[in-house]
C-alpha cells in the first residue's frame, strides 16, 4: 500500500552496469550491489519519475548527463571506457547532479583501511586498537602490540573480501595462518584489530544539498552465528544476502 497521497515531482535514475557473472558476482568497479527492482518499487511510491538505467558505453553516460536527473542512485564506482577510467560520482559533481555514495577521494579513504583508521583517530573518534602487518614480521606472541582476541582482514578492498570464520583469532598460530592466507590470496598486508564482540551497525550519512546539513541514518545488521559462534558480516554472508537489516529508532 502506498502511504503517500501526493508524489514529489522529481526524476531519479537507478544506475546499473551489466554483471557478467552470477547474482552478486564481484566487480571491481562496483562498490554497492543494488537490488534495483526493489529500489525502483520503493522510490516510485514517493517520486513521479523513477527509472533503471544500464550504462554499457560512454554514450550511455553522456545521455544521462544530458538528461540531468534530480538524483542518481547507484553503487557503481567507475567505468572503463576506451581504456580510460571515469569515476561516476566525480563526473556527476562536474554536472551538478546529486548522487548517493561517495566520490573518488572518499572511496580511496574507505578502501585503504589503515588510512581510514588514522583519519578516524585524527577526528578524535574512538576505534579499536590496530596495526598493519605482513607474514614474518612478528616472531612471537609477545611481539604483537595488542592483546588477543584479534580480528584480521586485508588492509585494502571492500565487500568483506578476505573476511571469514577464521578472521577472529585467539592465539599466535591462528594469527600467523590468517596473515599468511591474506598475503597468498590477495597479495595484501593485513589490518589487525582488537576484536570487538557485540552488535553490527552501518550508518548512512546524507547531506542536504540546499543547506549542507547532515543526517545520520543508522541500521543494525543482524547476522546468524557462524561455526565458531561469532556473528560476522563476512564475504559469504554478503554474497548470499544472509544478513537482515533493521532501522535504529532509539534516539540515544
Task: Identify the function of each model-found stretch.
Residues 1-99, 105, 111, 115, ...:
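ATP-binding N-terminal substructure of ATP-dependent carboxylate-amine bond-forming enzymes
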Residues 4-19, 65-66, 108-191, 197-198, ...:
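Active-site nucleotide/adenylate-binding loops and adjacent lid/helix of ATP-dependent enzymes
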Residues 81, 158-160, 226:
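Short glycine/serine/proline-enriched coil/turn segments at secondary-structure junctions
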Residues 100, 128-129, 217, 233:
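A short, local hydrophobic-aromatic micro-motif
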Residues 100-102, 159-162, 244-247:
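Short small-residue beta-strand/loop micro-motif enriched in glycine and branched aliphatics
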Residues 171-252:
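Phosphate-binding site of ATP-dependent enzymes
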Amino acid at each position: 500500500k502506498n502511504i503517500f497521497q501526493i508524489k514529489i515531482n522529481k526524476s531519479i535514475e537507478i544506475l546499473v552496469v551489466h554483471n557478467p557473472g552470477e547474482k552478486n558476482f564481484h566487480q571491481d568497479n562496483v562498490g554497492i550491489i543494488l537490488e534495483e527492482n526493489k529500489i525502483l518499487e520503493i522510490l516510485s511510491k514517493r517520486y513521479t519519475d523513477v527509472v533503471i538505467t544500464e550504462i554499457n558505453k560512454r554514450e550511455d553516460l553522456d545521455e544521462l548527463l544530458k538528461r540531468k536527473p534530480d538524483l542518481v542512485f547507484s553503487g557503481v564506482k567507475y567505468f572503463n571506457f576506451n581504456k580510460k577510467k571515469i569515476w561516476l560520482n566525480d563526473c556527476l559533481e562536474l554536472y551538478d547532479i546529486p548522487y548517493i555514495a561517495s566520490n573518488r577521494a572518499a572511496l580511496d579513504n574507505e578502501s585503504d583501511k589503515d588510512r581510514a583508521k588514522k583519519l578516524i583517530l585524527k577526528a578524535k573518534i574512538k576505534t579499536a586498537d590496530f596495526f598493519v602487518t605482513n607474514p614474518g614480521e612478528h616472531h612471537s606472541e609477545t611481539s604483537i602490540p595488542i592483546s588477543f582476541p584479534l580480528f584480521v582482514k586485508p588492509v585494502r578492498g571492500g565487500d568483506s573480501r578476505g573476511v571469514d570464520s577464521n578472521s577472529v583469532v585467539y592465539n599466535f598460530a591462528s594469527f600467523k595462518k590468517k596473515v599468511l592466507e591474506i598475503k597468498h590470496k590477495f597479495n595484501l598486508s593485513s589490518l589487525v584489530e582488537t576484536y570487538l564482540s557485540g552488535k553490527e551497525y552501518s550508518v548512512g550519512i546524507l547531506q542536504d544539498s540546499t543547506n549542507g546539513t547532515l543526517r545520520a541514518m543508522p541500521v543494525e545488521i543482524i547476522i546468524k552465528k557462524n561455526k565458531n559462534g561469532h556473528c560476522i558480516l563476512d564475504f559469504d554472508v554478503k554474497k548470499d544476502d544472509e544478513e537482515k537489516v533493521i532501522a535504529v529508532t532509539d534516539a540515544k
